């Protein structure tokens, strides 16, 4: 038998009834006096409960011989040895207490660590649930706290002012163009309308991205460029697997792609991941003919307009929608264009109807700008200077000065001489001061520049460029101008060629 405290054979063995363990009597009694508990189970224990064990004569002799042999083997003076033995027993008792305390603290620490880990798991689970719930939070909060149309328009106005305050936009200068490279023809779907996307670069100049799309084999194939050197081709699966083709495709900020399908159903697609972000059905009885997402002003919403003049802003993230102008019964628009400050929207049709809407004043009637019914409007542009509205017609160029009374021209209506043959297509850059015209008769590109002094267009005789004689007859053109140079996109009914122009 060994003492549970000292680890030695007890000279006077006793038994604790609580733990049923053997101890040295003096050590156990001292422990009970100090703590009042059993050393092993830590249950309450009194000295009276301690059971003394009376060893047999053989056991007593063995114990005495063991202790005596130990003492005599190490010490020579019996009294000193007895004192040392008592000190040793006291040390062992203290050591046992410390071990017990250490074991208790270790168990408590283990419990605390376990509870801490459990708390972390619970917190992580709650955080995951919070993140899941937060996805629906904007929608529910938007419904709970209704934002009025007036408050929305105030936000639109302030966002526009902040953008304008950043400074005046710069436009790259056109060099004298003497060389060209005609790139290989590509097919596109003419019935899919695309709108140029403007992106502000570090030089405070708007890069205009022109996009052509071909819908084929369940995929949308995009070719887009902002100058003669930056040409990209992207293919993304058509979100509509039933064979439906989009009627309008327009880019928005943060890699968003807006796809309008029949029935005024809009799909918002992430152009990087090809993931469908949202499906929206616009509640309008009329056909949507324009949609666009400004990348600097009011970037949480995109604008749409239908052929009767209903104009609305739709949130990318939820069902929030604000109608800023209601439909008319006496017009039928075919397209539109948004001013750079996002406060003016021009809606027009080929038969000479051109109305400009002030988006910050929904109660204000639109302004009708006079265009000859026979002019056949092809495209309307707001120039980068902010106050010119350029109207490209079949045979004439009309430019209005928005700073003056409605209908005031910035310069006299201009007709290019070659237009008399009816075989020329042209486009004007976003500055409103550079024009490229292509003649199907001579297969040549001609540059025209606006002269401030004479307020007229002049032909740049040094920039006449000829294409090969077997080039197709082109019916439409887009011009882009960026840091990488100037390019013209010449289009037929089903194909296009990119012409890179260099000094």
From Swiss-Prot:
InterPro entries in UniProt: Pre-mRNA_splic_Prp19_cc, Prp19, Quinoprotein_ADH-like_sf, RING-Ubox_PRP19, Ubox_domain, WD40/YVTN_repeat-like_dom_sf, Znf_RING/FYVE/PHD
Pfam family, one: Prp19
Residue intervals of the U-box domain: 1-71
Region (Interaction with CEF1) residue spans: 76-134
CDD domains recorded: RING-Ubox_PRP19
The entry's keywords: DNA damage, DNA repair, mRNA processing, mRNA splicing, Nucleus, Repeat, Spliceosome, Transferase, Ubl conjugation pathway, WD repeat
Positions of WD repeats: 328-367, 372-410, 418-458
Region (Required for self-association): 57-144
Cell location: Nucleus
Major enzyme class: transferase
Biochemical pathway: Protein modification; protein ubiquitination
Catalytic activity: S-ubiquitinyl-[E2 ubiquitin-conjugating enzyme]-L-cysteine + [acceptor protein]-L-lysine = [E2 ubiquitin-conjugating enzyme]-L-cysteine + N(6)-ubiquitinyl-[acceptor protein]-L-lysine
GO MF term set: identical protein binding; ubiquitin protein ligase activity; ubiquitin-protein transferase activity
The protein's Enzyme Commission number: 2.3.2.27
Main subcellular localisation: nucleus
GO aspect biological process, one term: generation of catalytic spliceosome for first transesterification step
Free-text function comment from the UniProt entry: Probable ubiquitin-protein ligase involved in pre-mRNA splicing. Acts as a central component of the NTC complex (or PRP19-associated complex) that associates to the spliceosome to mediate conformational rearrangement or to stabilize the structure of the spliceosome after U4 snRNA dissociation, which leads to spliceosome maturation. It is also probably involved in DNA repair.
Quaternary structure (record): Homotetramer. Component of the NTC complex (or PRP19-associated complex), composed of at least CEF1, CLF1, ISY1, NTC20, SNT309, SYF1, SYF2, and PRP19.
Miscellaneous comment as given in the Swiss-Prot or TrEMBL entry: Present with 11700 molecules/cell in log phase SD medium.
Assigned protein family: Belongs to the WD repeat PRP19 family.
Protein name: Pre-mRNA-processing factor 19
Species this protein is from: Saccharomyces cerevisiae (strain ATCC 204508 / S288c) (Baker's yeast)
